[in-house]
Amino acid sequence: ASTAVALLLTAFGVTGSGEFLGMNSTMWISFIFVSGFQIYLFWQGIDLIRRFLNFAGPAVYVVMIVLMISIWAKAGGGLLLEVGNIFSGGARSGGFEGLGSFGAFLAVFSIMVGYFAAVVINFGDFARFVKNENEMKKGNLWGLVGNVVFFSFITLMITGGTIAVFGEYVAQPTDMVAKVDNMLLTLVAAFAFFAATVGINMVANFIPPAYDLANLMPSKINFRTGGLITAICGFVVGGLWVSVITQMGMFPFVNTLGAILAPVFGIMIVDYYVIKNEKLDVNALYNDKPKGKYHYNGGFNHKGMVAWIISGYIAVGSVWPNILPGGLSDFFAN
């Protein structure tokens, strides 16, 4: 979102000076503005956030479709040729070296799992607002399956187009807009990308930890306080993003995060479908007494935590093989 604001400022001739933690003054102003706007939006409550998301989603689709058409018009037949190279596992398509298109598939699959692993754990924070189960199923069908397939098609076309037009793979949508060099598209795209990324931050990075912190210490932390704590932590991480985190690389960072959180989702699924046989005592879920059914041992399910540590260690090791013992390290390294 801050990159979108920086793009807008740059379009009007505002250039940054100086540098701190890898960001110039324009980027810092944009980052602080976006952080403040997110806190304001969060403070207004779930209803305003829902209305904001209903605007942000269609807006980014409009921009991406226009961007795809613009790049396709410039690329001509070269776009489809580059898309074919991506599917054939060409040199510029990414993925795991030496595995061709299957390697590219594995790379995309791991990124998708890493991304959704963080979101799906807190699915209940939003699913509880639906009117009935049928609405939830429709939302999952169109939001996860339909949306991901259609948006992936758009991004695939744009990716192939950037290679054909600019001779290089352009990863950031804001960079693509800047290269197209259309003032109207730049203005609309900046606002749309700003809205979309703020909306994603609300759903994936803001509301879930706010609920989690409030549930962790309900007598001392309410929902809003949890949101402020989250905002402070997010500001620190965001401030270090360019100078520290990006040095790790986007894919390793997302995959590491997914490797830590994905086992939690797996444990939840096994616990519900296999161990508890799809039966939950809802009233007992809110019973914090030591004799409660779900209090376990001191409030912690030690078996679940051991399962998470073991599976998480192996999952993180698939991203960083050097932390694993010989045999496993060689397997994931190769």
Model feature map: region roles:
Residues 1, 57-74, 111-119, 138-163, ...:
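Selective recognition of specific alpha-helical transmembrane segments in multi-pass small-molecule
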Residues 12-13, 33-56, 71-75, 122-132, ...:
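Membrane-water interface regions at transmembrane-helix termini and the short interhelical loops
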Residues 23-32, 215-244, 296-312:
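Loop-to-transmembrane helix boundary motifs in multi-pass membrane proteins
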Residues 154-202, 219, 235-247, 251-256:
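TM-loop-TM module centered on a large, flexible mid-protein loop between adjacent transmembrane helices
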Residues 1, 29-74, 81-87, 140-143, ...:
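Membrane-interface loop-to-helix entry segments
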Residues 2-14, 59-92, 115, 155-164, ...:
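Hydrophobic alpha-helical segments and their helix-loop junctions in multi-pass secondary transporters
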Residues 264-334:
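C-terminal membrane-solvent junction of multi-pass transporters and transport-like membrane proteins
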Residues 1-18, 199-214:
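Hydrophobic transmembrane alpha-helices that form the core helical bundles
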